């Protein structure tokens, strides 16, 4: 099991008094469902799980009254014995909540009722062209937490590098002291591996278990294909080719010396006026993260 930094944030959320229902948002396949189910198993006696993408029929539960007693009755009818509702002992997981805006509206009523914790996950929340209904967002009654693929420190944990070693490395960098040669070479090796493997949990697990980069590459290609499928399925028709062109230009953007995003690399003569909204769609979907005013840290001895 991969150790993730968000675990600490989840525990802080659970232990905070009078907490709101939680929404974990992030790109597809960054580990939201796995970490949510793992956290629920370790911190609650009972877990009630609904997935609106895999089981679209469960959206009907939220089509009528959002009274909590009514919802728990309908969920029990849908799940049978797998649904155990015990006040303050049950957590309800609403996976892929972007597929059911009414379920997001229901978060307000779960908050006001107060008997059950609710954790929702979503990967396409707020993107233009997909289930747009601002009235469904319960402003003030939900807490949003963003999840990302593994960062380099989490990648180090996955490779068995303990906290003491990481603390020693950070101390050297902060105090501008030389990193011991053996540690320096190991970190260089791991940084190169991270640059190739990336931070998607499936790719990281495959690399750690097999060390086969061809398997990692296959997983990466499948993830990219799923992102492109989302662009075709969920973006507005007029935006689909523009969004896909923006996304496919990213390798060229990153491979040039000047890291500033250049719209002309998407297509000759392209302008921000034509493509800025499409680039924003890709960011809103959690696929990219903009870096403003990047600074070079090549002088650090990592």
PLM region descriptions:
Residues 3-15:
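Pre-Walker A adenine-sensing motif
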Residues 24:
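Hydrophobic anchor at the beta1->P-loop junction of P-loop NTPases
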Residues 32:
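Conserved lysine of the Walker
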Residues 35:
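Hydrophobic positions on the alpha1 helix immediately C-terminal to the Walker A/P-loop
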Residues 57-84:
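Short glycine-rich substrate-engagement loop in P-loop NTPases that contacts/grips substrate
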Residues 117-123:
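Structural recognition of the conserved hydrophobic beta-strand(s) that form the central parallel beta-sheet
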Residues 127-142:
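Short regulatory helix/loop adjacent to the ATP-binding pocket of P-loop NTPases
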Residues 209-300:
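Accessory nucleic acid-recognition modules appended to NTPase machines
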